[in-house]
Amino acid sequence: MQEQISRRSLVLQSMAAVALAGSAWAATAAQPSSVTVHHAKGSTEVVRAPQRVVVFDLTALDAMHTLGLPVAGVPKAQLPDYLSSYAAPRYTVAGSLFEPDYDALSRLRPDLIIVGGRSSAKYELLSKLAPTVDFSVRGTHMLEDMDRTVTALAGLYGKQAQGRALMDQVRSEVASLRPLASRAAPGVLLMAINDKIMPQAPGARFGFLFDVLGAQSLLTAKDVPARGGPAFGFDDLAKLQPQWIYVIDRNTATGSAPGGGAIVPSTQVFDNAQVRSTPAGQKNQVVFLDPKGWYLMGSSGPTAMLRNVAQLKQVYQAAGQGQR
């Protein structure tokens, strides 16, 4: 009798296990095998949780890294320290920031390619090789476009909650900096290429400082010299008498100077009489922004933005809560 009960129990347990397995399979089968990803060029069907992902856009790579998502191929490029692990041999070098290596892509057979910014011009060609999305970020809509990228990537891998938490953190940190940035006296944002300086106005490439954080600019788009027009020099800077000077060092960011010449650090270039004659120079309010975080990343990756916010917050607080 006992033996019959034991056998019946085993049969029931086996049936229950089969039923549970069937339920799990049915739940998995109900999941769509692909996801529609909306991006700057439209929408693309992407396989759920892709593993062979090639990322040409560094801001998207920032988001992938921050969310802990798999990456198989990256461009050969200067990387900020927190992305330096992608220079390891286990990652396929898929080209440069501007030009894909089509042979490398053919060997890798990616199930997703991500472009943006510098690589966005290759979208049409790459989309013929594999599902491709363009996560380019507009300078005047940085948070909106970052949210689109983070939300799309998190959704591909079932990490929606993590994506929402990340964007909540970014928005919170940006909001905490805005009062300090907006109260700071007007300043000038300059991109430096050795001793050549180029002013940057609101609404342009590095609009994060003015358009997102609300810092005041002494210059408008009309004040910025047109390409091929008269150069803007240190004498012009001295005439403006800015309270704040923000500097993005292009050569330090890229690790190269035009024509293969020597790199002269901006800290050395800006150590001159004209800068010292300005209120910014006299108050120690010449801010050398993180070169890679601003020039390469454009402040538009989540970690890049958080780091750049932290630097500016520290600067403004040291200057007296951003009121100088």
Regions found by a protein language model. Give the residues of each.
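N-terminal secretory signal peptides and thylakoid transit peptides that target proteins
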Residues: 2-17
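C-terminal segment of N-terminal export signals and the immediately downstream linker at the start
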Residues: 4, 22-34, 43-44
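A short, structured surface patch at a secondary-structure boundary
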Residues: 52, 58-107
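Basic- and aromatic-lined ligand-binding clefts that recognize polyanionic substrates
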Residues: 52-56, 60-64, 162-219
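Proline-aspartate-enriched helix->loop->beta-strand connector
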Residues: 109-115, 131, 241-246
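Extracytoplasmic ligand-binding site segments that recognize negatively charged/polar headgroups
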Residues: 121, 136-152, 185-208, 253-256
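Ligand-binding pocket segment of bilobal, Venus flytrap-like solute-binding proteins
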Residues: 198-201, 225-257
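Structured C-terminal subdomain patch of bacterial secreted/periplasmic proteins
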Residues: 249-324
